[in-house]
Every structure is written in structure tokens, then in C-alpha cells.
Amino acid sequence: MNSILGLIDTVTNTVGKGQQIELDKAALGQQRELALQRMSLDRQALNNQVEQFNKLLEQRVHGPIQSVRLARAAGFRVDPYSYTNQNFYDDQLNAIRLSYRNLFKN
């Protein structure tokens, strides 16, 4: 009788553990989905930051260039490189883009 009860107890424990494993797998699957969604949102946020940075950078670069053009149109002699260094801004932008790209390499 004890051996039958022991066997029933063992089977019950095994079934319970199997169910717990299945529940754990389902929970891990949900956590994985949530993590993937969070990564997607983080990637979108970083892309938005890069986009905003690009707009700011464009304003900082093209603003002085526009000023130089207006000054030239008004008859002044202007050295555009004393106002802005396009290569410096391009290099900075490329470095930032590269660092963001490296962040998401798989």
C-alpha cells in the first residue's frame, strides 16, 4: 500500500514539475517578447535622438553658411571657414552614427 501511495505521490510530483516547467517556459517567452519590444522602443528612441541631433547639427552648420552668403551678397569679403568647419561637424556626426550602429550589432 505504501509503495502504491509512494508511486502516486511520485507521479503527482512529476506531473506538477512538468506543469511548472511549462509555466516557466511560457513566462520566459513573455519576458523575451517584452525584452524585444523594449529593445525596439529603445532603438526608436535612439533613432529619434539621432534625427534631432542631425537637425540641430544642420542648423548649426547651415546657419553660419547662410550668414556667410548674406554677407557676401551685401558686398563683404568673408572667409567661410572662419565661421564653420563643415568637415569637423561631419566627422562628429559620423562618429556618433557609428557608435549608435555598434550599439545594436547582433
Curated annotation (Swiss-Prot):
<dbReference type="GO" id="GO:0098021">
    <property type="term" value="C:viral capsid, decoration"/>
</dbReference>
<comment type="function">
    <text>Minor structural protein that forms a portal-like structure at a unique three-fold axis of symmetry, following binding to the host receptor. The virion attaches to feline junctional adhesion molecule A (F11R). Once attached, the virion is endocytosed. Acidification of the endosome induces conformational change of capsid protein thereby injecting virus genomic RNA into host cytoplasm. The channel formed by VP2 may allow the delivery of the viral genome through the host endosomal membrane.</text>
</comment>
<keyword id="KW-0946">Virion</keyword>
<comment type="subunit">
    <text>Homooligomer. The portal-like structure consists in 12 copies of VP2. Interacts with capsid protein VP1.</text>
</comment>
<keyword id="KW-1232">Capsid decoration protein</keyword>
<keyword id="KW-1035">Host cytoplasm</keyword>
<protein>
    <recommendedName>
        <fullName>Minor capsid protein VP2</fullName>
    </recommendedName>
</protein>
<dbReference type="Pfam" id="PF05332">
    <property type="entry name" value="Vesi_VP2"/>
</dbReference>
<dbReference type="InterPro" id="IPR007996">
    <property type="entry name" value="Vesivirus_VP2"/>
</dbReference>
<dbReference type="GO" id="GO:0030430">
    <property type="term" value="C:host cell cytoplasm"/>
</dbReference>
<comment type="similarity">
    <text>Belongs to the vesivirus VP2 protein family.</text>
</comment>
<keyword id="KW-0167">Capsid protein</keyword>
